[in-house]
């Protein structure tokens, strides 16, 4: 009996994660108290930080909230930080939590409008280079004001919808009835080549769209959660943030869009595949049927969502309230005027954001440990001993390398709080502090496109339903992101070093 109970407990621990992963987490939990007793709190603190980064890097094996949360519960029990310190950290960063709770949910109710826009572009533009550029530009623009994950989710929804329609037609099924999309057994030989080409076409569009969220996300206060966190520390509003970051973000945006066009024209790194004409004909016929069947209520809902989006942009630009509260207003406006009054339909809007919001609390617990043990103080002190003109570039590189394998919010939180403490201690001028803040912000946003671990939108795409359907693997994502990584990361470093 005891053996079966033990087996059930072992099986339930971290669910479907591999056994080796479970063993490593258990090893961490045993090792930390031993390190604390034998070599002291600083070494144990560094071990905890590295262990937490490991859980972020292994996000595809297990969502980091569970293993990271276990590590942080242990840290609290070992008194490496205190519940009060964690509470104060959360209180200080409450605007970021509001953003994730309400803004992401608010954008959820705009999905129909966004899906409509992306669908129109996909079928209305025949040039692949122009189509890719439009996808990248629209993703960048939307991500500058909306949540990057939601924008990515909309692009994925459009891609899944179009893929499903053609896959069913190629399999001889009704395009409006459910079928097994993960199997090609029923696909006629005549359509297999077109289907493979369509997969490559969708892969390139999705990657352009995902990169677009990073290009636009770095530009504004609400583009990424870490932007709001840094802006909050600096006391910057929407316009302040945009102009402070513009010397880096706008040249990188231009270079990123140029890279998009060149990749399509030169057909490098898996880009440049065209949509087969038979596929276009099937999708156009399907879209025409949808347009004809659209009801008056659905048309009104699109207008309401568009008006709410306009109000959102105006409110953000004028900073009429905290970003999260503006998101709550968007929820109220759209739901009130489109008839969404059911509690369960409303609740679904919050499902996407709450896991990451919970994980953010764990981030801040790690930051509380870092503060209490002063883990990063020597590193920041060393950077500040460098000549003033070298400090922004060095911070950019330090942020970029860590952000490529870890979470941007976590990395940005660590560096901005440590640099701010140095500023408060009289270690630099306000002007130089602002320069370093821009270096930290761009360093966490731009080089992180290198891997799916670095960008939440990339990780979301990799773990979505569309990835296996279009044969988008981890390695293929890294390969397709490589030219963007070199251009965005390299130009970002140059701009931070020489143009700020």
From Swiss-Prot:
A GO term, aspect molecular function: sodium:proton antiporter activity
Keyword field contains Zinc-finger: no
Membrane-topology annotation of the record: Multi-pass membrane protein
Keyword tags: Antiport, Cell inner membrane, Cell membrane, Ion transport, Membrane, Sodium, Sodium transport, Transmembrane, Transmembrane helix, Transport
Entry's localization field: Cell inner membrane
Main localization, broad class: membrane
Gene Ontology CC: one annotated term: plasma membrane
UniProt entry tagged with the keyword Membrane: yes
Transmembrane segments: 11-31, 34-54, 58-78, 96-116, 129-149, 150-170, 205-225, 241-261, 311-331, 350-370, 394-414, 450-470, 477-497
InterPro entries, alphabetized: Na+/H+_antiporter_NhaB
Function: Na(+)/H(+) antiporter that extrudes sodium in exchange for external protons.
Name of the protein in question: Na(+)/H(+) antiporter NhaB
Gene it is expressed from: nhaB
């Amino acid at each position: 009996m005891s053996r079966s109970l033990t087996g059930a407990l072992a099986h339930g621990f971290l669910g479907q994660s591999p056994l080796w992963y479970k063993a490593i987490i258990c090893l961490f939990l045993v090792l930390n108290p031993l390190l604390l007793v034998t070599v002291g709190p600083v070494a144990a603190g560094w071990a905890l930080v590295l262990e937490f980064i490991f859980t972020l890097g292994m996000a595809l094996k297990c969502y980091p909230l569970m293993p990271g949360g276990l590590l942080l519960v242990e840290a609290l029990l070992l008194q490496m930080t205190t519940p009060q310190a964690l509470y104060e950290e959360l209180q200080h960063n409450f605007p970021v939590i509001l953003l994730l709770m309400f803004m992401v949910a608010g954008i959820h109710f705009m999905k129909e409008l966004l899906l409509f826009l992306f669908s129109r572009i996909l079928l209305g533009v025949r040039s692949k280079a122009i189509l890719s550029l439009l996808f990248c530009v629209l993703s960048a623009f939307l991500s500058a004001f909306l949540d990057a994950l939601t924008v990515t989710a909309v692009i994925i929804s459009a891609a899944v919808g179009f893929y499903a329609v053609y896959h069913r037609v190629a399999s001889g099924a009704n395009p409006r009835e459910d079928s097994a999309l993960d199997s090609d057994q029923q696909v006629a030989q005549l359509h297999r080549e077109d289907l493979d080409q369509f997969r490559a076409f969708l892969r390139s569009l999705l990657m352009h769209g995902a990169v677009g969220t990073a290009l636009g996300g770095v530009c504004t206060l609400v583009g990424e959660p870490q932007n709001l966190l840094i802006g909050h520390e600096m006391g910057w509003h929407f316009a302040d943030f945009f102009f402070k970051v513009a010397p880096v973000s706008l040249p990188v945006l231009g270079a990123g869009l140029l890279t998009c066009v060149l990749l399509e024209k030169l057909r490098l790194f898996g880009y440049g595949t065209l949509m087969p004409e038979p596929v276009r004909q099937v999708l156009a016929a399907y879209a025409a049927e949808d347009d004809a069947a659209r009801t008056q209520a659905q048309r009104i809902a699109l207008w309401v969502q568009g008006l709410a989006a306009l109000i959102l942009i105006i409110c953000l630009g004028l900073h009429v309230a905290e970003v999260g509260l503006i998101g709550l207003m968007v929820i109220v406006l759209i739901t009130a005027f489109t008839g969404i009054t059911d509690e369960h339909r409303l609740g679904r809007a919050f499902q996407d954001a709450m896991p990451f919001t919970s994980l953010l609390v764990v981030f801040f617990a790690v930051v509380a440990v870092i503060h209490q043990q002063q883990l990063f103080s020597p590193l920041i002190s060393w950077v500040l001993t460098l000549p003033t003109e070298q400090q922004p570039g060095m911070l950019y590189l330090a942020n970029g390398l860590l952000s490529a394998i870890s979470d941007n919010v976590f990395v940005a939180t660590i560096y901005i709080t440590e640099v701010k403490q140095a500023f408060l201690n009289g270690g630099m001028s306000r002007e130089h502090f602002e320069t370093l803040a821009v270096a930290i912000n761009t360093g966490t946003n731009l080089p992180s496109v290198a891997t799916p671990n670095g960008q939440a939108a990339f990780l979301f795409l990799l773990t979505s339903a569309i990835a296996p359907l279009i044969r988008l693997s981890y390695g293929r994502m890294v390969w397709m992101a490589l030219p963007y990584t070199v251009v965005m990361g390299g130009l970002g470093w140059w701009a931070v070093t020489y143009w700020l």
